[in-house]
């Protein structure tokens, strides 16, 4: 058991008999005195794949479930399945494209370090990505010499099809660092 304010992204909870994986959390602090902070959580139902949204007060208890995390690397595509290989014992983990559609936007060709699969009692639940990823821009408006001092953004398309806002001075072919959860530009990659 954990309080709602202790729940983090990537944790699993048992809610009304459903096994739910926490995808996103919004914290809402009401301005009225004495009002408790609300936590709006977006879940993915592990069994059905449906998205579920619930609100909790900070002191409400939730039934957490212990998950096993295994480090993996992207291996290959087999039809509509994506195969990830365990780094230690080379166990293959197969995901259907629909299961990891959002995550695929952040996985560059050849994979990325820091990926993990979440399992519970041998059942494959989800693919978890690291906080950031370095990607190459394939298309964006040309950079402007002497761009204004104000921070203006423009859309940029990555090699995976992901579109995010980047500063005006960034040009195609540059590698940038992206915060995965917030889908935002963090800076140029090393």
UniProtKB/Swiss-Prot annotation:
The protein's matches in SUPFAM superfamilies, at most eight in alphabetical order, are given as: Nucleic acid-binding proteins (SSF50249), Translation proteins SH3-like domain (SSF50104)
**Molecular function GO terms recorded:** translation elongation factor activity
GO cellular component annotations of the record? cytoplasm
> What Pfam families does the annotation carry?
EFP (PF01132), EFP_N (PF08207), Elong-fact-P_C (PF09285)
Origin superkingdom:
Bacteria
CDD domains, A to Z:
S1_EF-P_repeat_1, S1_EF-P_repeat_2
Write down the NCBIfam families for this protein, in alphabetical order.
Answer: PRK00529.1, PRK04542.1, yeiP
- Annotated family: Belongs to the elongation factor P family.
Designated name of the protein: Elongation factor P-like protein
Q: Which organism is it from?
A: Yersinia pestis
């Amino acid at each position: 058991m954990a309080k709602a304010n202790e729940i983090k992204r990537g944790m699993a909870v048992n809610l009304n008999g459903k096994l739910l994986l926490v995808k996103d959390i919004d914290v809402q602090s009401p301005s009225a005195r004495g009002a408790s902070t609300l936590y709006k959580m977006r879940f993915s139902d592990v069994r059905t794949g449906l998205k579920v949204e619930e609100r909790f007060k900070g002191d409400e208890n939730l039934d957490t479930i212990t998950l096993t995390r295994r480090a993996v690397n992207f291996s290959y595509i087999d039809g509509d399945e994506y195969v990830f290989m365990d780094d230690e014992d080379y166990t293959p983990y197969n995901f259907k494209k629909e299961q990891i559609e959002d995550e695929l936007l952040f996985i560059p060709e050849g994979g990325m370090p820091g990926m993990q699969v979440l399992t519970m009692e041998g059942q494959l639940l989800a693919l978890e990505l690291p906080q950031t990823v370095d990607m190459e821009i394939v298309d964006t408006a040309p950079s402007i010499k002497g761009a204004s001092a104000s921070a203006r953004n423009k859309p940029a398309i990555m090699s995976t099809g992901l579109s995010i806002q980047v500063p005006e001075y960034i040009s195609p072919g540059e590698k940038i660092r992206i915060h995965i959860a917030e889908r935002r530009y963090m800076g140029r990659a090393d």
